[in-house]
Amino acid sequence: MLFISFAFTDSSKIILDRKQSKNAFRQDSSLDMSITRNESELIEFIEATMTTHLIPGLSVSVVKEDNIVWQKHFGYANIEQNISVNENTLFILSSISKTVTGTALMQLFEQNLFELDDDINQYLPFNVSHPDYPLIPITFKMLLSHTSGINDNWSVMPYYDGDSAVELNSYLSDYLEPDGELYNANTNFTSYMPGANFNYSNIGAALVGLLVEEISELPFNVYCNENIFEPLQMNNSFWFLSEIENLDSVALPYQLN
């Protein structure tokens, strides 16, 4: 199996990752794949794509089985300071982190700690219900499939300001409970009945993270470190900037004006 991984600077912070430890993948010194024969074309394509889409920095790895067969770094991690992307650059992965969030929850499912059709209110410290359909329970399956009816209200979803000083529990209760400071029945929920329609929801994914905390009785980042990152030797993957020793290694996110 051939796996091609792209990491590039993004505008939102959720999880960071970089090239894994040397024990995780073996570098294939022979590089006897067709990609090496077409390397110049691949580089030309990547650079043209970066120009077209105004991508400041980019890393590419091609993995075959457990071997890194090709990797290269392009552009800048920090344009203002003229810092180039290198093998130690940490990238903000944005919604790719939902694969980790989902994995964390499903690990707990495999331990028979809940059922996918369970009402999430059985496990939360506060109640969540759709204002138009209060008698229809929101289930784990709905959260994982983005059919919960919970909507993203971007006016109260800060994601540019680094690590939040607000606990996940507090933020979500303010967003989802009727007496919460961030609650708005019209904008925080869709018009659809829970389970009826797909609506991509970052708040729903955050709620999955809170459920991991409540069921595992561990902070979400601690659970992921102990049960996902450490076992997989993802030694440079983090949920918080405060966990990173050298912040200069983080590719600065940019946004088009």
Feature roles, as predicted:
Residues 116-131, 231-232:
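Short, glycine/proline-biased beta-turn/loop segments that scaffold the active-site neighborhood
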Residues 40-46, 60, 66, 90-120, ...:
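Active-site SXXK
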Residues 20-31:
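Acidic/histidine-rich, surface-exposed loop or edge segments in extracytoplasmic proteins
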Residues 31-91, 115, 181-189:
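Short, conserved catalytic-motif segment at the N-terminal edge
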Residues 4-14:
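Bacterial Sec-dependent signal peptides at the C-terminal "C-region" and cleavage site
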Residues 78, 132-257:
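Short, surface-exposed loop or secondary-structure junction motifs
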Residues 34-41, 54, 85-88, 92-100, ...:
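Extracytoplasmic/periplasmic, Sec-exported soluble proteins
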